[in-house]
Amino acid sequence: MSEKNAYAKSGVDVEAGYEVVERIKKHVARTERAGVMGVLGGFGGMFDLSKTGVKEPVLVSGTDGVGTKLMLAIKYDKHDTIGQDCVAMCVNDIIAAGAEPLYFLDYVATGKNNPVKLEEVVSGVAEGCVQAGAALIGGETAEMPGMYGEDDYDLAGFAVGVAEKSQIIDGSKVKEGDILLGLASSGIHSNGYSLVRRVFADYTGKELLPELEGKQLKDVLLEPTRIYVKAALPLIKEELVNGIGHITGGGFIENIPRMFADDLAAEIDEDKVPVLPIFKALEKYGDIKHEEMFEIFNMGVGLMLAVSPENVNRVKELLDEPVYEIGRIIKKADDSVVIK
């Protein structure tokens, strides 16, 4: 007992940590899927790969966080969607390689354990896992007084998925003449927030900017990142896509070239990009050069598909949403992305 009291005096509340574990169990249970072994609280999460039915399995992993979007979640005291952002950033990366997410682990570090707040965070992680079809099989909550302020926390995630070896998407199948199809983003997603926070530093978050169509600024800024797994998986299974790009930090300019070989380029028709109102607001209030917007943000397209012309109609049939035909693959002359 004296050892626990000594630890508590140093700022670590072990009892609060136990409460967090109990609170999150019901959220973890929502994410159960075939292949999960063991129970929450073991030393390691286990998954039976044979349950996937994949003949030649290749494991694909990804890890990410949500950057300084966390600072807005803390500022506006809204913590129930930031976990979805974390899941999205990881699973969207591995779906771009042709992998189906299998399981997810999260890491939360905080200055002071607040069981209610941390339950909200993990509830968002669980919601993201449900949307991605991934099991939340483990995680870590670290109370680190002195490292973080009492109200501060950081969040990171780790996703593991499986791809059929013959269906791996690595850019090698993308060719000149392929059509670039864009799937809409839900908003800013989880990149560029250091700039976003600077632009709106003097705003309360309750503003109804005319560009935002009646929505409060804080709600638009914290709109959770879209998860593309359920949209993309059927296309991968039917081998309809040659390349996939997750449009994250670096926007169009940095991410689209990751889809294909160095001798190719993407020609983008800017008029066909479904630019969301928040990006118009950022450009206006932040006095950002128009061309720079495409170097920073997703501009309304969160996932890019490179598709052979003969497969475009089938892709559109399978996707129960608007699909934006925004460009094509060309031979590279100079720049890897040409916006016209």
Curated annotation (Swiss-Prot):
CDD domains: PurM
Keyword flag Protein transport: no
Protein name (database record): Phosphoribosylformylglycinamidine cyclo-ligase
Superkingdom of the organism of origin: Bacteria
Matching Pfam families: AIRS, AIRS_C
GO cellular component: cytosol
GO biological process: 'de novo' IMP biosynthetic process; adenine biosynthetic process
Pathways per UniProt: Purine metabolism; IMP biosynthesis via de novo pathway; 5-amino-1-(5-phospho-D-ribosyl)imidazole from N(2)-formyl-N(1)-(5-phospho-D-ribosyl)glycinamide: step 2/2
